[in-house]
Amino acid sequence: YAPSALVLTVGHGESAATAAPLRAVTLTCAPTASGTHPAADAACAELRAAHGDPSALAADDAVMCTREYAPVVVTVDGVWQGRRLSYERTFANECVKNAGSASVFTF
């Protein structure tokens, strides 16, 4: 099997370069889901469905979020099925982050 091991972070701010990480978790998806991520099984299943592309994660359109701007930045770094992966995205606030990434960034 090709390795799939990631480190995910979340912090307040508009970019990873200026935001201090508030939380970080590890996520290993091969051969089985493990790591410090609180929902490793669900997060791995969602990443598999998105072919390892965090930008393709399905958003939950049923969630209603306020329009407050309190930016939250997430990062993913590591290896997905043997390929290097580096991803960064800024969400308008924590609610939008949680709705926009299902289990992957909910930690």
UniProtKB/Swiss-Prot annotation:
GO CC terms of this entry: extracellular region
Disulfide-bond pairs as recorded: 29-44, 65-95
Pfam families tied to this protein: SSI
UniProt entry tagged with the keyword DNA-binding: no
Alphabetical keyword list: Disulfide bond, Protease inhibitor, Secreted, Serine protease inhibitor
Subcellular location(s) per record: Secreted
Superkingdom field: Bacteria
Site residues by UniProt (Reactive bond): 67-68
Annotated GO MF terms: serine-type endopeptidase inhibitor activity
Cited function: Inhibitor of subtilisin BPN' and trypsin.
Family in the record: Belongs to the protease inhibitor I16 (SSI) family.
Subunit structure of this chain's protein: Homodimer.
Protein name as it appears in the record: Subtilisin inhibitor-like protein 3
Organism field: Streptomyces coelicolor
